[in-house]
Regions:
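Regulatory and interdomain segments flanking nucleotide-handling catalytic cores
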Residues: 1-4, 8-197
């Protein structure tokens, strides 16, 4: 156990030092929107294999990165929801009246799906099928990432709000507000219109 503690301490010290050094590469004088995703990527690279819980009585199956990313996403959604509903006394709303807040539908799980165009992937000739299949799959993945980044930009959110993306699907956690719903509706119409043209 003593040697495990020593290895763990050295590992965490190395991660902390690397984190400190990498933070110097980010220009914090710019608006937060310009560096938040870089910060998120840096955090993912360093904290994916660090458990969020240090308790030896718990199974360490959730990474510090995933825990922190989801916490940031939910915190951002709560802030947006409260702001949209004209609530500025956060302490009262979230701590003193927490039971009431838990009953509110402050969050929305949003799914984006482009897998309906799978026919595009699989209508290929036998000659060079594998190469064509890979290229079309890659194209759809890049297309999904582009759509996702555009949507996040319109919603003024970071990639922290992405719960899952892959295989032509993605899931986002969003604030359940009229403004969010309107933005989603406008975005869906624009993307569908672009795809039809």
């Amino acid at each position: 156990v003593g040697s495990e503690m020593c290895i763990r301490d050295r590992y965490y010290s190395a991660v902390k030092e690397k984190f400190r050094n990498l933070l110097t590469t980010i220009d914090f004088s710019k608006p937060v929107e310009q560096y938040v995703n870089s910060l998120l990527e840096l955090f993912e690279g360093l904290c994916t294999y660090i458990p969020s819980s240090t308790s030896t009585k718990e199974v360490a199956d959730i990474s510090l990165f995933d825990h922190s990313k989801l916490t940031a996403a939910f915190a951002g959604c709560i802030y947006t929801y409260l702001k949209a509903n004209g609530i500025s006394d956060y302490k009262t709303e979230l701590f003193k009246n927490s039971e009431k807040f838990y009953d509110k539908k402050a969050f929305m799980l949003y799914s984006l799906d482009i897998s309906g165009i799978q026919k595009f992937i699989y209508t290929i000739n036998i000659q060079g099928a594998l190469k064509t299949l890979r290229a079309r799959s890659f194209y759809l993945e890049i297309f999904m990432e582009h759509i996702l980044d555009e949507l996040l930009d319109k919603l003024e959110l970071s990639r922290a709000n992405i719960i899952y993306t892959g295989g032509g699907h993605c899931y986002l956690i969003l604030a359940n507000t009229d403004e969010t719903k309107q933005t989603l509706d406008e975005f869906e119409k624009a993307v569908n219109g672009w795809l039809i043209d």
